[in-house]
């Protein structure tokens, strides 16, 4: 009996504990990211931001969560009730399961699979379904138009993201995210320099992928009231909100892994190796999240035609050209990694 327990049940308990150990801190980070956003935007606009609930307003996210929890969930009369309820759950769950393959430090990863990049791409492409279902099930023209915009926007920029990731795979020679980080430890400086423009393109693309300013067309308040989540209240609205911010943290972690060395120190200095890799990972992700907030506070929203033109006529040809350029340079210099 004990053999069966240790062979079958004990590994499942360990996996469940790992999932809880990742999920609970992530939800707390998402809650306090909303607080950080309001504080940063407030400071940039020369005002205080939330500062009433608790010291320095630190309990504001908890107050918001309690408020949304006790609000009445209103379901529109002519909506598809089952899909209407499922849509925010799909969005939130997909934003969490992408973290399964992200390495927080050396050896600290829930599932260190050999196709981690494909897993991340699959999860990011599935996330559009929650938004489409929400727009269609709401039986509202504003929600439906926001959902159509979102699906077109996400599909447009996924093409560029995929080509950017191909350049990363060409230089690192692996689909394993831990392997990508370790390959950057010994990567020549000129390859890092070649990947720099692709890092910028990738970050701009994930801004569009997560529907953040200046690409928040699916929820443009001045045109669509609130976009695909206009009919949602209570925990349905909260789950969409949490899903959006969890996706922000996830794409920041992806950018950190692909272009900033993940948990590696930023410079090859011996005494920096004494600092735990988890600290460097959190620091880099925090910096990218600050860039998200900074961009929201400073840039105006793009027009829809400008958004599509940037995706299809600028980023797609540029990334395609860069894939050819990087592969040609790697073959010419005999630096193409063996797979």
UniProtKB/Swiss-Prot annotation:
It comes from Rickettsia conorii (strain ATCC VR-613 / Malish 7). The chain crosses the membrane at residues 9-29, 50-70, 82-102, 115-135, 161-181, 187-207, 235-255, 275-295, 311-331. GO terms for molecular function: NADH dehydrogenase activity; oxidoreductase activity, acting on NAD(P)H, quinone or similar compound as acceptor; quinone binding. The keyword Membrane applies. NCBIfam families: PRK06076.1-2, PRK06076.1-6. PANTHER family: NADH DEHYDROGENASE SUBUNIT 1 (PTHR11432), NADH-UBIQUINONE OXIDOREDUCTASE CHAIN 1 (PTHR11432:SF3). Its EC number is 7.1.1.-. The lineage of its organism: Bacteria, Pseudomonadati, Pseudomonadota, Alphaproteobacteria, Rickettsiales. Its main location: membrane. GO terms for biological process: aerobic respiration. This is NADH-quinone oxidoreductase subunit H. GO terms for cellular component: plasma membrane. NDH-1 is composed of 14 different subunits. Subunits NuoA, H, J, K, L, M, N constitute the membrane sector of the complex. InterPro entries: NADH_UbQ_OxRdtase_su1/FPO, NADH_UbQ_OxRdtase_su1_CS. It is an enzyme of class 7 (translocase). It is found in: Cell inner membrane. It catalyses: a quinone + NADH + 5 H(+)(in) = a quinol + NAD(+) + 4 H(+)(out). Keywords: Cell inner membrane, Cell membrane, Membrane, NAD, Quinone, Translocase, Transmembrane, Transmembrane helix, Ubiquinone. PROSITE patterns: COMPLEX1_ND1_1, COMPLEX1_ND1_2. Belongs to the complex I subunit 1 family. It is a multi-pass membrane protein. NDH-1 shuttles electrons from NADH, via FMN and iron-sulfur (Fe-S) centers, to quinones in the respiratory chain. The immediate electron acceptor for the enzyme in this species is believed to be ubiquinone. Couples the redox reaction to proton translocation (for every two electrons transferred, four hydrogen ions are translocated across the cytoplasmic membrane), and thus conserves the redox energy in a proton gradient. This subunit may bind ubiquinone.
